[in-house]
Amino acid sequence: MMDTRLSEDDLAFQVEVRQFLTEAWDKELAATYGNIATMKEGAEEWPTRLYHKGWVAPHWPVEYGGTDWSVTQSFIYNSERAAVGAPEVLPFGVTMVASVIIAYGSDEQKEKFLPRILKSEDWWCQGYSEPGAGSDLASLKMRADLEGEEYVLNGSKIWTSYAQYANWIFCLVRTDSSGRKQEGITFLLIDMDSPGITVRAIKTIDG
């Protein structure tokens, strides 16, 4: 019969996690995060507190700042985090683009972006959906044409959460239209301060 009880080391880890979360996810931060007017401040402060503890990116390889937690430790952390109502770190930087950079990025890209993601020095947003391409990303039309050493982009993205805060966007664009529509799609990292980028708000029911 399987023994599902926590080991002494895991119990000690649970105590450490519980104590940290009790102190780090305080009422003031929870209120800041839960208010749409101050959400940006809260969404920056929470991962900063996790960073100083060394827990902002537990799923990363240790060499880049991960924790090497066991499956049980990850379960303990997420269970305790949920119990106090603390959110996951916004996924765009620490989970989505970082995973791609770690797996496929050059050494230069890793050195440039990963430390800044860990320290929450960059806000990332996701540029996938387009006015005519949502769930079917193979239908995307935003073009990126290589001119010299730079790509020139033409097109629009939509439903780009937190674009109003972001200084970087990871974007799917079409670099080749000669094959099937599922081909010729490239993943680009784009500085939101690049010339020609305009961010427009979409009014939603919650303001």
Per-region residue spans from a language model:
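Amphipathic, small/basic residue-rich leader segments at the start of a protein or domain
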Residues: 1-92, 108, 112-119
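Short, well-ordered beta-strand elements within core beta-sheets of diverse protein domains
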Residues: 2-4, 99-105, 143
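Buried hydrophobic positions in well-ordered alpha/beta secondary-structure cores of metabolic enzymes
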Residues: 10, 21, 54, 61, ...
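N-terminal glycine-rich flavin-associated loop
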Residues: 89-108, 134
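A short, Trp-centered hydrophobic/proline-enriched beta-strand micro-motif
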Residues: 120-128
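Active-site-adjacent elements of ketosynthase-type condensing enzymes
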Residues: 132-140
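A short core secondary-structure module
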Residues: 141, 149-150, 154-200
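Short, intrinsically disordered, charge-balanced linker/junction segments flanking boundaries
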Residues: 204-207
